[in-house]
Design a protein with these regions (language model features):
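Loop-rich non-cytosolic ectodomains and luminal regions
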Residues: 1-441
Length: 441
């Protein structure tokens, strides 16, 4: 079996848990705290549901629900037959006859079904119109096809039919979600009990997040739906829930006032749950810069320089300021010969300089946040964005005034862009990624 812990035990050895045994992965003075009767939701890159650490002694799954957002949305009628055939060629199937030692290798065949019909019998509703939700029963059919009991409402489905192929979750390609789930909840079956997670007897709820890689805009909606699903599912089972979110973005003001952060605050009050989110690794990545001017001064003249590395296809620059401040902005291309001035009126504007298309969105304060936002989306008119040092010139306006004087600038997190992209004079302050900046997380 693939190892899911790797070198994580070194960090555990230096953790704040007293008397923590790095060999067994357990607190020697709290052996009764095993997570039994609770659930852990892993919102990440998916989980290898076949791994022994996520299975019971009898081989059945410990995963109560697995929502794979990356799969095409599949609608099922009462006979559990896929009626959304337009997406069928992109679905991932696994043969019920290819099991070996209860550890089924992935089968990427997509066109071996007969009559373009797949069988799926999830008992979990999918009101999100996104991906496929697999129930505990669905996963057990994949893991133990010859011994699975068939629900009475699925009498037309034969798990031993040699031509039947079951829809299955897609692979956890990066392995990150599997690694995280092992640290949280692995029961140690793959290592004969030598390496266990923190809560080895907890149940699991898994969401493989859909990643909109083609868009420069951060898709927080999929994450919000994932949290909503996990909390509602756990509450329906009366299970205390711990939600782990190994996800973070620089897209936002980092003040707890975004829709995502406010959503996290509200959902934390629903049922019995606690939300844990990764804070990111942005401190030394040069993706944040700040200016702090003197309030009520008459003149102000500064520049922010940032480098776009060769090979960037798209990225964004985000600027946040207090609404009461009046600033004049002008963006210069690396040549210094092309530039454009930001309009004073909110709206969406398009510019083309240095063979690069830049969409500028200006948003005024909303009922839930008091800041003005400038969002610049860079994309290439050829192959890549023009590389080099871009300069944002900032001045006070002749008729305006500076009340607060603080300006914050963000580029995408390091995972989204080339490591050489960044501000020339960065700031390591306020570099926690969203949603770890929410007050209830």
């Amino acid at each position: 079996s693939r190892p899911i812990y790797e070198n994580a035990l070194t960090g555990i050895d230096a953790s704040c848990f007293p008397d923590y045994n790095i060999v067994t992965g357990r607190n020697v003075n709290a052996t009764t705290l095993t997570g039994k009767g609770t659930a852990i939701a892993v919102l990440d890159s998916g989980v290898d549901y076949r791994h022994p650490d996520f299975r019971n002694v009898d081989g059945s799954t410990r995963i109560l629900a697995y929502w794979d957002q990356s799969l095409p949305f599949a609608s099922f009628n009462k006979e559990n037959t896929n009626i959304n055939s337009s997406n069928s060629d992109n679905l991932h199937y696994i043969s019920t006859t290819n099991s070996q030692n209860n550890y089924i290798a992935a089968d990427n065949r997509t066109n071996t079904r007969r009559n373009n019909v797949s069988k799926h019998s999830s008992t979990i509703d999918n009101p999100y119109n996104l991906g496929v939700i697999f129930s505990e029963e669905d996963l057990n059919r994949l893991l133990m096809p010859k011994s699975s009991s068939v629900p009475s409402d699925s009498s037309t489905f034969s798990v031993t039919d040699p031509v039947t192929e079951l829809l299955s979750p897609s692979e956890d390609v990066s392995g990150h979600g599997t690694h995280v789930a092992g640290i949280c909840s692995g029961n140690g079956r793959a290592s004969n009990g030598n390496s266990q997670g923190v809560a080895p007897e907890s149940s699991l709820i898994v969401v493989k997040l859909k990643n909109e890689t083609a868009s420069v805009y951060t898709d927080y909606a999929n994450l919000m739906m994932a949290v909503d699903f996990a909390v509602r599912f756990a509450n329906s089972r009366s299970l205390p829930l711990s939600i782990n979110i190994s996800y973070g973005s620089n897209d936002g003001s980092h003040t707890g006032s975004s829709l995502l952060e406010l959503f996290m605050e509200q959902v934390s009050l629903y049922g019995k749950n606690v939300i844990c989110a990764a804070t990111g690794n942005e401190g030394l990545t040069r993706r944040h810069a700040s200016l702090n001017t003197i309030s009520n001064q008459n003149t102000y003249d500064k520049s922010i320089d940032f480098t776009i590395a060769p090979g960037e296809r798209s990225l964004y620059l985000e600027i946040w300021q207090t609404f009461a401040d009046d600033f004049f902005y002008e963006l210069f291309a690396p040549s210094g010969l092309e530039s454009f001035v930001f309009p004073a009126v909110p709206g969406i504007y398009a510019y083309m300089i240095a063979d690069t298309t830049i969409y500028l969105t200006i948003n005024n304060p909303t009922p839930y946040q008091p800041f003005r936002q400038y969002f610049l989306s860079f994309s290439s008119n050829t192959t890549f964005i023009t590389s080099g040092t871009w300069t944002l010139h900032i001045e006070s306006t002749p008729t305006g005034k500076i009340v607060d004087g603080r300006l914050q600038f963000w580029l995408p997190s390091k995972e989204a862009t080339n490591s050489a992209t960044g501000f020339l004079v960065p700031s390591s302050d306020m570099t926690f990624t969203i949603p770890s900046t929410a007050s209830s997380v």
